[in-house]
A protein has these predicted regions:
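Charged interaction scaffolds used for protein-protein
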Residues: 1-9, 31-34, 38, 42, ...
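Extended, low-hydrophobicity segments enriched in charged/polar residues
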Residues: 53-56
Length: 110
């Protein structure tokens, strides 16, 4: 599964990816991965532009829109972006290392 997508455009290479921080910003802006199918006209542009935030935060919306409009296989692109987004969310719950030596533990108490 892809962690990044690279897009060459007008002599520049754009690296698209998501981080916990960019995912959080997207959610605060109203993005919901669960609404991707029911509100595609809103959520797909938010998903695509959100992927620029980690490495290209100052890219203008007009440039992002031109890049998107010129790309082929948009269904494949949106699928890959959605998987990358979801992977970033899952890092909040994943145990990075099975070896927990030295890491704090937790316990539920009554």
């Amino acid at each position: 599964m892809a962690k990044r997508i690279e897009i060459p455009y007008n002599g520049k290479k754009y690296t698209l990816e998501f981080t916990r921080s960019t995912v959080s910003s997207m959610e605060k802006s109203g993005f919901s991965i669960n609404e991707l199918g029911s509100k595609p006209a809103t959520m797909i542009p938010m998903l695509f532009s959100g992927a620029f935030a980690a490495n290209h935060p100052s890219t203008k919306v007009a440039t992002i829109n031109k890049i998107y409009d010129g790309l082929g296989d948009k269904q494949g692109l949106v699928k890959a972006l959605a998987e990358m987004y979801s992977d970033s969310v899952y890092t909040l719950l994943a145990d990075e290392d099975e070896d927990s030596e030295g890491n704090p533990g937790w316990e539920a108490v009554e």
